Each structure stands twice: as structure tokens, then as C-alpha cells.
């Protein structure tokens, strides 16, 4: 399966995600960036937009996406991400939650 970390251009988190989160993601996690309505990814935008359209919490970024057995599974990490960011907490909880999601086959 494929693993994706999706984030958007929200000003109060974009730099933190790009400078702190993305460099520490597992090597098997690919990035999808939403710059407004434009999808920036190594995959064709049409393919990604179909997957994003099916997200349960589409506006709750950052978001995790996994493709398992041709099924799209997703989870928002918005709450834990912003709690950590706003309260300057260690990132362990966020990475543990993300790794648990990606490990779930």
C-alpha cells in the first residue's frame, strides 16, 4: 500500500510542517500539498483529487491517507497536531499516532 501525508497552505502551520514534520516522516510516506485548490504531488492531480474528495474530514488538515487493497483509508491528525503546535509539546504523540495509522494494514 501507499502512505500519504496531506497538508495545506494554512499560514500558521505550513512552515512548521515543512521544516519539522516532513523531514522526520518515514521514508515510505509521500507528500500531498494543497496550495489553495491546486494539488502538488508526484501523482496526477486527477488521481489525488478523487482520493481527497473521499476524505471524511476534508477540511481538517494535516491529514493521513493510506491505500490498502485498493481502498482509501484516512485519518485527520488536526487535533493532536494543533494541540502540540499551540502548546509547544513534544512531537512524540503526533508521530506515534501517524506511525500507528500507517502500520495498520
Task: Spell out what each predicted region is.
Residues 44-53:
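Short, surface-exposed amphipathic charged segments that create phosphate/polyanion-binding patches used
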Residues 73-105:
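Ser/Thr/Gly-rich flexible loops in soluble cytosolic domains mediating phosphotransfer, phosphorylation
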Amino acid at each position: 500500500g501507499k502512505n500519504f501525508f496531506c497538508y495545506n497552505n494554512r499560514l500558521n502551520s505550513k512552515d512548521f510542517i515543512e521544516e519539522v514534520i516532513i523531514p522526520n516522516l518515514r521514508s515510505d510516506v509521500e507528500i500531498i500539498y494543497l496550495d489553495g485548490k491546486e494539488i502538488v504531488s508526484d501523482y496526477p492531480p486527477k488521481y489525488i483529487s478523487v482520493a481527497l474528495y473521499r476524505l471524511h474530514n476534508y477540511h481538517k488538515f494535516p491529514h493521513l491517507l493510506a491505500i490498502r487493497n485498493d481502498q482509501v483509508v484516512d485519518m485527520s491528525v488536526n487535533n493532536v497536531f494543533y494541540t502540540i503546535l499551540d502548546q509547544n509539546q513534544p512531537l512524540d504523540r503526533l508521530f506515534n499516532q501517524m506511525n500507528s495509522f500507517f502500520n495498520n494494514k
